[in-house]
């Protein structure tokens, strides 16, 4: 999947000040093998040069201990019962080259841990490979058959189950993915499921498009 923030092409770094866009690809496979490429996402926050110190305003504030950040419970399974999709999910970040570290196992998917969890404001992104020359068809291949209205069931690490409804399914050229929308961190909760689709391009060793399925809370 490749989000394109501010007109950025999949797999191409974005301008400073916007999250980096990058392609998620499988390791090289045998020539001509139908190995998928998956969506790219904004790069994880990186340590940069410290910001210049700001002048201290002349206002006395109440002394208080910082509020503890809420505990994040990661999703561990996503299912679309009507399409036979039932896939374990693990938290993933980025690889050293800036690509999303999608699980190599095509029967697993990755949740982008630098974005929201399902149910939090913004778009929670879960991506997986559509297939592999050695492993065959992946679990996320079933996304290509989803339809608006399909139920999506998400289970988190605490055993909490939430239900979602598919509102859209699109096959988008990787060079035209709306990265900012796919990876937004604010606004109503949304679940974004991504895999590869479209024709396989032997010259690049991957698929031309990304299948993007968007679901919203069922209640």
Name each model-derived stretch.
Residues 1-14:
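N-terminal export and membrane-targeting signals
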Residues 17-148, 153-158, 168-219:
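Solvent-exposed, non-transmembrane regions of membrane-associated and secreted proteins
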């Amino acid at each position: 999947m490749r989000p394109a923030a501010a007109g950025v092409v999949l797999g191409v770094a974005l301008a400073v000040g916007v999250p980096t866009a990058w392609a998620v690809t499988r390791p090289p496979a045998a020539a001509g093998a139908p190995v998928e490429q998956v969506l790219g996402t904004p790069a994880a926050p990186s340590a940069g040069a410290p910001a210049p110190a700001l002048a201290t305003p002349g206002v006395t504030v109440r002394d208080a201990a910082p509020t503890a950040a809420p505990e994040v419970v990661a999703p561990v399974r996503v299912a679309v019962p009507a399409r036979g999709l039932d896939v374990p999910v693990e938290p993933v970040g980025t690889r050293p080259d800036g690509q999303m570290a999608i699980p190599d196992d095509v029967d697993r998917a990755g949740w982008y841990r630098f974005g929201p969890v399902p149910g939090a404001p913004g778009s929670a992104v879960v991506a997986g490979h559509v297939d592999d020359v050695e492993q065959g068809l992946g679990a996320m291949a079933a996304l290509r058959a989803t339809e608006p209205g399909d139920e999506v069931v998400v289970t988190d690490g605490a055993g909490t189950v939430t239900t979602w409804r598919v509102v859209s399914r699109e096959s988008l050229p990787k060079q035209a993915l709306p990265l900012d929308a796919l990876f937004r961190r604010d606004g109503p909760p949304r679940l974004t499921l991504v895999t590869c689709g479209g024709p396989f391009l032997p010259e690049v060793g991957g698929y031309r498009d990304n299948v993007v399925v968007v679901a919203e809370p069922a209640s």
